Amino acid sequence: TPIKSSAASDVYKRQILQYVQAGQEGGNAFADVVSGDVTPSGKMTDTWAKDYYDYPGAEVYSYKSGDLMKEKYEEGIFVGYRYFDTFEVPVRYSFGYGMSYTDFEIRTNDIKVSGRGMMNPKVSVTVTVTNTGDTYAGKEVVQIYASCPQGRLVKEFRRLAVFGKTKLLAPKESQTMTITFPLYQLTSYEEESASWILEPGMYGIWIG
């Protein structure tokens, strides 16, 4: 759902706590977070643009397309954060963004590919996450993105391949974790052959 966040950002300069459909324990959870008993560790699952018309579908949505009964998505593969990343559109809050009461350092230890064929190989990324803060314990979400070569198939700038969450880390505590994802996550669909293709070229891994 497109969200216009300019007004909220002007009023709340430092932070916004998104509190949606929290359930019967939502009140207790809210109190735990605002009191500092629990450190927030959630990340954005979509992109908040600076302006409504920054969303690619804004110009043809609803009555603007001339047909209230149908909505045509013209973005192709550039849906959500893939559009904003690929075309370098400035945003208010990016996909995967989220604040915490503490700070973390993520150090990459190893990246390797194992297995054979198309369905069995996997990419393993090993990182060490350290809570570098002095006061609050917290959890961090490690996000792994991949950039695919721009060959004959059109691709987005980068895609989310996998993510993993640490345990609750005390100040100065570290955790080493290995996060894996199947190699076919890096394939692209070719309509002519109706198949998923892993094109040759340079692939990039983004960790954060």
Map each language-model feature to its residues.
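Single conserved hydrophobic/aromatic residue that forms the stacking wall/gate
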Residues: 1-8, 12
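Residues embedded in well-ordered beta-strands within globular domains across many folds
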Residues: 12, 17, 45-48, 110, ...
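Acidic, His- and aromatic-enriched active-site or binding-groove loops in soluble protein domains
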Residues: 15-27
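Acidic/polar loop patches that form or flank catalytic/metal-binding clefts of enzymes
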Residues: 25, 39-58, 79-80, 90-93, ...
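Glycine-rich beta-alpha loop elements in corrinoid/cobalamin-binding modules
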Residues: 30
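Active-site-adjacent elements of ketosynthase-type condensing enzymes
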Residues: 59-67
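Intrinsically disordered, low-complexity Ser/Thr/Gly-rich stretches
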Residues: 78, 88-92, 101-208
